[in-house]
Amino acid sequence: CRVENKCPHTVCCDRSRCSCKLIRTRPLMYHVCVC
């Protein structure tokens, strides 16, 4: 599991082509690894 540079340390990706995206859902905001 590797951590993306644009993501918090709690979000990591297992694949090299994964990218981190910020999901905005009121009232929460969180990062998700999208492969």
UniProtKB/Swiss-Prot annotation:
Q: Predominant location of this chain?
A: secreted
Q: Which UniProt keywords apply?
A: Disulfide bond, Hydroxylation, Secreted, Toxin
Tissue distribution is:
Expressed by the venom duct.
Decide whether keyword Lyase is in the record.
no
Q: What protein does this entry describe?
A: Conotoxin Ca15a
Question: What are the cysteine partners in each disulfide bond?
Answer: none
Q: How is it modified after translation?
A: Contains 4 disulfide bonds.
Q: Mark the residues carrying the PTM 4-hydroxyproline.
A: P8
Cell compartment(s), UniProt: Secreted
The cellular component terms of Gene Ontology attached to this UniProt record, alphabetical and capped at eight, are:
extracellular region
Sample GO molecular function, one term:
toxin activity
- Native source species: Conus caracteristicus (Characteristic cone)
- What note about domains is in the entry? The cysteine framework is XV (C-C-CC-C-C-C-C).
